């Protein structure tokens, strides 16, 4: 019996040790800070090949009618390194919204958009939470609706839609999680229906687990606070149960988050390098 037990322990230990981050993350990437402003730049999401959308507050061209600039969306062209305001025309009332847009995600055919924005009323704790909005784009019109599971007392942020599995990931501080903000998911049923929201247990911890994204192989990436180092980026490999911290250069002494695989040659993330500093956006490209 002792021999069998020892063999089982050896097998389990071997499985844990064999688990690793995807091979392409150990390639020789060149780091470049591509967006550095006096604003907070974050919320990176892939739009199409060679383009990504991100969030920023206070950039030139944004409305400054408020004492604190609102968060809005911008487009980055990897080929030209140019930033331009993201065209929100046709996205229901999003263009006219005076409130902050927290982050956004697109289906691969760009016919479905999921975004977080703050509500217009305070909740029972006295702060204004974020809600998730679904935008379905037709040829001549678009339809916007608040996701049916949203409770106005809690925040729902950082959506990521995986077209391959028709699954929407997001973070929320709603009750029932492990603590702080947890990562949740729901699967699409038909055109307008969604499954019951589920907690992504293997990824979550008693701390804030934030900015979920997937790569083409369905490996999950997210960030959580680690001691005095700030936010670190973790990977939950497809089929695994234990998240792994990414190797350098993706994690640094500072806040590293919003890891987005544009393709296997280009990875984008947000980083706060200095305490109380602004977040900038970095590009990692293969040599």
Task: Name these PLM-found stretches.
Residues 1-4, 18:
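Positively charged n-region of N-terminal signal peptides that target proteins for export
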Residues 13-14:
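N-terminal signal peptide c-region/cleavage motif recognized by signal peptidases
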Residues 19-287:
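Short, conserved micro-motifs composed of acidic
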């Amino acid at each position: 019996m002792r021999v069998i037990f020892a063999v089982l322990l050896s097998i389990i230990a071997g499985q844990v040790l064999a688990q690793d981050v995807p091979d392409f993350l150990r390639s020789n990437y060149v780091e470049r800070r591509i967006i550095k402003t006096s604003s907070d730049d974050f919320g990176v999401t892939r739009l199409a090949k060679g383009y990504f959308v991100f969030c920023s507050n206070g950039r030139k061209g944004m409305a400054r009618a408020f004492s604190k600039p609102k968060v809005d969306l911008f487009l980055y062209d990897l080929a030209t390194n140019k930033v331009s305001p993201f065209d929100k025309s046709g996205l229901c009332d999003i263009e006219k919204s005076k409130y902050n847009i927290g982050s956004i995600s697109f289906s691969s055919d760009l016919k479905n958009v999921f975004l977080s924005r703050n509500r217009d009323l305070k909740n029972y704790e006295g702060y204004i939470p974020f809600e998730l909005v679904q935008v379905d784009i037709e040829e001549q019109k678009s339809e916007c609706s608040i996701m049916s599971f949203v409770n106005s007392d809690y925040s729902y942020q950082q959506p990521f839609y995986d077209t391959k599995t028709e699954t929407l990931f997001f973070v929320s501080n709603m009750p029932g999680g492990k603590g702080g903000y947890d990562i949740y998911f729901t699967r699409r049923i038909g055109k307008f229906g969604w499954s019951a929201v589920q907690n992504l247990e293997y990824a979550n911890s008693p701390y804030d687990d934030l900015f979920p994204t997937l790569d083409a192989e369905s490996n999950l990436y997210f960030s959580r606070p680690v001691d005095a180092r700030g936010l670190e980026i973790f990977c939950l490999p497809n089929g695994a149960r234990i998240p792994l911290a990414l190797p350098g250069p993706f994690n640094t002494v500072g806040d590293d988050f919003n890891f987005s695989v544009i393709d296997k040659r280009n990875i984008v993330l947000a980083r706060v390098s200095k305490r109380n500093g602004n977040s900038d956006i970095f590009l990692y490209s293969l040599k």
